[in-house]
């Protein structure tokens, strides 16, 4: 047996012996082999995205005033003061996805996250409350979002040849939602 790291080996012409179990979730869902992060022909690297709602967006100082300590997660805040930035708070947090595994849209940067919220420097983008921001996910963010008890998972067929998975993350007691929306997993026979 093996996992996504064994995919190239299993598909090679080498004598692999008898393989009876390969867990290929990362390769299939994210469209990459895991040793060298090469794209797998016929699969999409953007099959699943995470969409989070803006719940606050203001121009603020990049650092708070006063003494700055580590976060609740043991991380030190950024040392560089970048002056005023377009700071945006999103309704998605560490309990929903691994922030280190999210790739923000061009011109935006993830600054940090609490259990319930993600802080984003929106750059030159002026975002309004209620707008949605779409992120690409790595395996760590995907696993956390799909196994989170705060995320509902729904499988939808986009077309006859493409399958989509939609996941909705909703914080307890909040009306805002974060959504993982795939754009396609490639062709799946018989779908």
What is each PLM-predicted segment?
Residues 1-184, 188-191:
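Active-site anion/phosphate-binding pocket segments in diverse small-molecule metabolic enzymes
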């Amino acid at each position: 047996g093996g996992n996504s790291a064994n995919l190239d080996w299993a598909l090679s012409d080498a004598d692999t012996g008898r393989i009876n179990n390969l867990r290929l979730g990362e390769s299939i869902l994210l469209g990459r082999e895991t040793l060298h992060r090469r794209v797998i022909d016929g699969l999409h690297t953007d099959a699943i995205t995470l969409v989070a709602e803006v719940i606050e967006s203001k121009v603020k100082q990049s650092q708070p005033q006063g003494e700055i300590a580590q976060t609740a997660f043991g991380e030190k805040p950024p040392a560089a003061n970048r002056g005023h930035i377009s700071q945006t708070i999103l309704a998605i947090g560490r309990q929903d996805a691994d922030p280190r595994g999210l790739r923000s849209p061009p011109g935006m940067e993830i600054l940090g996250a609490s259990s319930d919220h993600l802080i984003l420097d929106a750059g030159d983008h002026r975002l309004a409350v209620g707008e949605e921001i779409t992120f690409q996910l790595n395996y760590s963010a995907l696993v956390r979002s799909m196994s989170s008890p705060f995320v509902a998972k729904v499988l939808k067929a986009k077309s006859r040849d493409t399958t989509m998975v939609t996941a909705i993350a909703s914080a307890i007691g909040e009306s805002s939602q974060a959504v993982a929306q795939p754009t396609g997993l490639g062709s799946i026979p018989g779908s």
